[in-house]
């Protein structure tokens, strides 16, 4: 006696509940795109006064004089780039090291708890990081780290000037601490996607543990690691509260990392409520538009790089 195979029948797409469901889901998806377009439109329309007044010169001059309505965003762009790049210099080696340890060398009993605590750092509010930086990091820098750097490397100009603790160096360090969970988490997921037979094949050729990690794992995951780094950069570019509390908030371009600075996000947080003139307000909104577009581009590039490695595959653990 053979079982009769009954073909599955496709539900009618004309039924009212199905149409309502599909319409609701489609609306949810399109609403995100609509919100993105609406944000860009609103920022562009409200920054048009500044754009017509200063043009591209707005991004190439360092004047910031609300009284005389002369505005230039260069100090804020400089502060954003310097603090973010400094954060990457500090955070990338630490993040990759954490990811390699948790995926390749950490005992299985500790792998889960360690990964949890690393990711827990990303859930801490930025204002808490800022408070910690004010009461712990800044005194440490002003009393010990910056005087040492000034004595040994002051001739470079990067570590010269008064050692107050507040400045670009403090902002870069606190940003580095904040982006470590992002970079390490993405890197760990990418490393776990590398097939186990890739590791075994390299070891079978007589490679050491370090050579296996360097050649068999890191080399195959470098695009995804780069994506995680760029994703961390996107977080650093847009970070506001913690940076505002320790960077000094002075619109200047200084060579020394000890000097106070300003970032694009910080100037928006500090001065938006004080902007009384239309041109002043429009200039701040134009800075916000530039920061928004840069962040979108950076994050999109990061997601693309991560996707080239994972190809949509879920991360796989290995023994």
Q: What does each of the following model-derived ranges do?
A:
Residues 74-101, 229, 291:
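Transmembrane alpha-helix signature in integral membrane proteins
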Residues 6-24, 43-87, 107-108, 161, ...:
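Periplasmic/extracellular loop-to-transmembrane helix junction in inner-membrane transport proteins
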Residues 96-101, 111, 115, 153, ...:
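Membrane-cytosol interface at the C-terminal ends of specific transmembrane alpha-helices
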Residues 87-118, 302-311:
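Transmembrane-helix boundary motif in ABC transporter permease subunits
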Residues 116, 120, 124, 128, ...:
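Transmembrane alpha-helices
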Residues 188-192, 196, 273-319:
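C-terminal transmembrane helix and the adjacent membrane-cytosol boundary/short C-terminal tail
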Residues 243-292:
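Interhelical loop and adjacent transmembrane-helix boundary motif
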Residues 52-71, 129-177:
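Membrane-interfacial helix termini and adjacent extracytoplasmic/periplasmic loops
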